[in-house]
């Protein structure tokens, strides 16, 4: 019956999760079209590959479609959704389309509140180095591939599994990874943390009887669900009880070096493994990838080479290099997608480790009013650890403002805490200039957030604001 579906239309085709699936479908030979509110690198790439992409949503866009793919960000009052429903065109959730792709391959699904994109990228890179030619769909741009998706000829499909809308429960992988479990996207789970944890259990229970759950031993919430999982479990982490663990860890010039111990009856050691990423959190991400690679029998030489040569993921501790400071000298510019206090803390710790003794300047844009409200005190705590802070207004992501959960409220709370004096930047368009006014020679500047702040480092690096 699948041959009846020839043209697939994506509503919001430029989104991180949507564009990757669209790219794989283009490469599978489907006629792909899509609409989005704005032009982006993702939409331009898809156009170059032959997809028909239009700006703006209109009922006419779906006239020739056999199926409509939507993310949870697309509302029922979208004109394309209304038109598809009137024409009885199937409306397919993004995760369901990913699940269809996964049925064609052996799926490796990476879940967890933090670290999904980096871990998925590491797994894809290791499998590629091991000549397994994987298909991958990633929530960020894998620098080595120049894309966030690729159709491979091998047996495996590596993808992120999204818990934010519980859509990961549609996937049927053969290997599932859970990096950690934290309180985020709690609206989906009725603000009930027990329900969130149960969703992860249900996700792992979707594994077949021969499947493997790769779980982080260091995360207390992941550890707490292990007894509820009736599948083979491989534990990874820094803990001595992990099956795959790291020892002799040291930071060196923005990289991490460590030994890997694999305990499975006998013990094997990989000495002096080099990971071309900073931070203990990335050591854990690498251990998860090593665990997966070991399960699918990637040679150790390929694992070691892929980790040492890993060139990163777009907006995950992405280094823009040295930028001229207006007052003379230069500053180091880094961009990161972090938007939850836990991942922000890990990234800032990684920066301290990679650049010891240097002043750390953070330009941060909070993402969603609900997250700002739910994690308010944690944001105050983590933002108080930097040496200088430029704070933007909350990126709404479609949400209505919430009283006492906006940028000004966060700025006031930080002043009361007294550890850092924030500079509030109401319009994100003014952020590049605000950074240049605050920066000194030798500083490390990190732009951080999941919203429109992603455009700021490019402007700083190209000296647009200094012209």
Swiss-Prot record:
Mind telling me which Pfam families this protein's record contains?
A: Mur_ligase, Mur_ligase_C, Mur_ligase_M
Q: Where in the cell is it found?
A: Cytoplasm
Specify the pathway: Cell wall biogenesis; peptidoglycan biosynthesis
One GO CC annotation: cytoplasm
Xref: InterPro entries: Mur-like_cat_sf (IPR036565), Mur_ligase_C (IPR004101), Mur_ligase_C_dom_sf (IPR036615), Mur_ligase_cen (IPR013221), Mur_ligase_N (IPR000713), MurCDEF_pg_biosynth (IPR050061), UDP-N-AcMur_Ala_ligase_MurC (IPR005758)
Enumerate the catalysed reactions: UDP-N-acetyl-alpha-D-muramate + L-alanine + ATP = UDP-N-acetyl-alpha-D-muramoyl-L-alanine + ADP + phosphate + H(+)
Tell me what organism the protein belongs to. Answer: Azoarcus sp. (strain BH72)
Q: What is this protein called?
A: UDP-N-acetylmuramate--L-alanine ligase
List ligand-binding residues for ATP: 112-118
Principal localisation = cytoplasm
The EC number(s) this enzyme carries: 6.3.2.8
- Biological processes, Gene Ontology terms: cell division; cell wall organization; peptidoglycan biosynthetic process; regulation of cell shape
**What role does it play?**
Cell wall formation.
- Its EC top class is ligase
Annotated family = Belongs to the MurCDEF family.
